[in-house]
Swiss-Prot record:
Tissue: Expressed in liver, pectoralis and gastrocnemius.
Gene it is expressed from: SLC7A2
UniProt keyword terms in alphabetical order: Amino-acid transport, Cell membrane, Glycoprotein, Membrane, Transmembrane, Transmembrane helix, Transport
Cytoplasmic face residues: 1-37, 87-103, 184-191, 270-289, 361-385, 431-489, 544-554, 603-654
Residue ranges, compositional bias (Acidic residues): 631-640
Protein name: Cationic amino acid transporter 2
The organism of origin for this protein: Gallus gallus
Length: 654
């Protein structure tokens, strides 16, 4: 039995959960952001330069005019993830986003994996957007900057950029300084650039509807076949099919529309930066859900309007994949409008750069404050900004932008983002079926305390009765469980959620790599597909039968467990689509992260220090279990160092 002790202790270390106390929700960074600031941040980071490029690329190669439907499908898939983030923003209004949510619900190891991948995603995002900003500005100057550096600073090494991008470094360091100065000033800059970007997009939409032609959505297949014969010199062949699809609204069929939706899904990535502002926004329980939902709605309307205007102005098969809007304006005789588009593109890149850089130091700060990364990164400035985390993140991003060719690394961003989306949806499923949720901390009042105490007593009493009645697991208790959640029903849901993730992985792999066998109606593939689909549906229905926690928060995901389950399915399916090279690079980054975690983080974890007082250095501290109220108040020695630095009366000062 002795050898089992260290192993069990080690496992407890990996699954210990963050215990958020009410005091930690009060002592925070400078709360100076409004709901409008969050909406502008979400719109700015999500509605980046892709809106000026992506619509033309997808419409020409995948969707045609039905790109508007592709954006609608992508928006619905993104909203499912956004709603899960919104509920957690209402439940846990602290800095950390998906990292913190995973720490509270699933445990420390998964939290570190999530945070470590988000760091890589934001670093690559910041560096690539900075280089894109530099490249766009260089285009406006006739490529004089790139010509100069290629002549005098050319780098001929594999994996490195063609030339060092000094301008991108300047942009990142300038933005790092702005963020270090204070979040309030950064929010003002972001609102200005976001407003200009939206005005430019409104100009594009109105122009497109004025100069557009509905006939561009009704091009005949015969006309496209004639074009194909001319383009490919197929005049001597019979039964020629069009290389531009079959015409009409969906020239590439519904499969093309779905393929376009998969690409358009990434256009909505970025709203999760709102979830990192939990300690810097006033009334976060309401502001974060509103900010996420409204920003996604605004972005969908912008993508929908621009793609509709673009495909109305110009036939989809003539669209330019790199500069669709300037070419479309030239096509309708409004050539000078390209300068307006250029201004909007630079503003969009500016807000996108801020949207990538803003959450990066906050994830680093949250992990360092919890002891999983080096403690010096948790230091805050007198203006209550994560100073050292911001500067460190800025320097690393600047080095990446200065030296490396980031095109090969951009796909790794998708893994970090999709993994975070999947885990947040998983956490929502797990938490809603737990017997007690005590980390949502309303403002104190004697009346609320008395009411809450009476509710807890009644809930605990009934829960205890149910636990006695359900002491043995059976099919009857699975289908007809108690009216209130118990430890047994919570464990049942946890097992089903794990099974759900396994089924989704199998279903995604089969539909990705076994498409040929399914199309040929191979018996084994059809049987396996049917088994996975039926098991997936039955698992969701069994989860739905379990009792949910009755505690209400400002925002809760509707249609549980169906929406989070569909979100997990969409996200994992998109992860499976990524190339093997991307997963190899991801594995290398994770290996580096595990070295840091198992040599430093697991020993310096703040939750591990809290456990020391119980005589078990790695005892599991669930963020969901109720604690004795006296213990929660009388624990000054366990207070976080950063929280001590931020006195209560200073939290409102910026």
């Amino acid at each position: 039995m002795l050898p089992c002790g260290p192993a069990l202790t080690f496992v407890r270390c990996l699954v210990r959960k963050k215990n958020i106390k009410g005091e930690g929700l009060e002592d925070s960074l400078c709360r100076c952001l409004s709901t409008l600031d969050l909406i502008a941040l979400g719109v700015g980071s999500t509605l980046g330069a892709g809106v000026y490029v992506l619509a033309g690329e997808v419409a020409k190669s995948d969707s045609g005019p039905s790109i508007v439907v592709s954006f609608l499908i992508a928006a619905l898939a993104s909203v499912m993830a956004g709603l899960c983030y919104a509920e957690f923003g209402a439940r846990v209004p602290k800095t950390g986003s998906a990292y913190l949510y995973t720490y509270v619900a699933v445990g420390e190891l998964w939290a570190f994996i999530t945070g470590w991948n988000l760091i890589l995603s934001y670093v690559i995002g910041t560096s690539s957007v900075a280089r894109a900003w530099s490249g766009t500005f260089d285009e406006l100057l006739g490529k004089q900057i790139s010509h100069f550096f290629k002549t005098y600073f050319k780098m001929n090494y594999p994996g490195l950029a063609e030339y060092p991008d000094f301008f991108a470094v300047f942009l990142i360091l300038l933005l790092s300084g702005l963020l270090s100065f204070g979040v309030k000033e950064s929010a003002w800059v972001n609102k200005i650039f976001t407003a200009i970007n939206i005005l430019v997009l409104l100009f594009v939409m109105i122009s497109g509807f004025v100069k557009g032609d509905v006939d561009n959505w009704r091009i005949s297949e015969e006309y496209l076949i004639n074009l194909s014969e001319i383009a490919e010199n197929f005049s001597s062949y019979k039964n020629v099919t069009s290389i531009y699809g079959s015409g009409g609204f969906m020239p590439y069929g519904f499969t093309g529309t779905l393929a376009g939706a998969a690409t358009c899904f990434y256009a909505f990535v970025g709203f999760d930066c709102i979830a990192t502002t939990g300690e810097e926004v006033r009334n976060p329980q309401k502001a974060i859900p509103i900010g996420i939902v409204v920003s996604l709605l605004v972005c969908f309307m912008a993508y929908f309007g621009v793609s509709a205007a673009l495909t109305l102005m110009m036939p989809y098969y003539l669209l330019d994949e790199k500069s669709p809007l300037p070419v479309a304006f030239a096509y309708v005789g409004w050539g000078p409008a390209k300068y307006v588009v250029a201004v909007g593109s630079l503003c969009a890149l500016s807000t996108s750069l801020l949207g990538s850089m803003f959450p990066l130091p906050r994830i680093v700060f949250a992990m360092a404050r919890d002891g999983l990364l080096f403690s010096f990164l948790a230091k805050v400035s007198k203006r209550q900004a994560p100073l050292l985390a911001t500067l460190t993140a800025g320097v690393i991003s600047a080095i990446m932008a200065f030296l490396f060719d980031l095109k090969a690394l951009v796909d790794i961003m998708s893994i970090g983002t999709l993994l975070a989306y999947s885990l947040v949806a998983t956490c929502v499923l797990i938490l809603r079926y737990q017997p007690s949720l005590t980390y949502e901390q309303p403002k104190y009042s004697p009346e609320k305390a008395t009411l809450a105490a009476s509710k807890r007593e009644s809930a605990v009493s009934e829960s205890q009765i149910n636990m006695i009645q359900e002491s043995h697991f059976s099919l009857q208790t699975l289908i007809n469980p108690s009216s209130l959640p118990t430890e047994q029903t919570a464990t049942t849901v946890n097992c089903f959620v794990g099974l759900l993730a396994f089924l989704v992985c199998g279903l995604s792999a089969l539909t990705t790599y076994g498409t040929h066998f399914i199309a040929n109606l191979e018996p084994w593939s059809i049987c396996l597909l049917a088994t996975l689909v039926v098991s997936f549906i039955v698992t969701i229905l069994l989860i739905q039968r379990q009792p949910q926690n009755q505690q209400k928060v400002a925002f809760m995901v509707p249609l549980l467990p169906f929406l989070p389950s569909l979100s997990i399915l969409v996200n994992i399916y998109l992860m499976v689509q990524l190339s093997a090279d991307t997963w190899i690079r991801f594995s290398i980054w994770m290996a580096l992260g595990f070295i840091i975690y198992f040599t430093y983080g697991i020993r310096h974890s703040l939750e591990g220090r809290h456990s020391d007082g119980d005589g078990d250095s790695c005892s599991e501290n669930s963020g969901l279990q109720e604690k004795n109220p006296v213990e929660e108040v009388d624990e000054p020695e366990n207070a976080n160092e950063s929280d001590k630095f931020l006195a209560r009366e200073r939290t409102s000062e910026c």
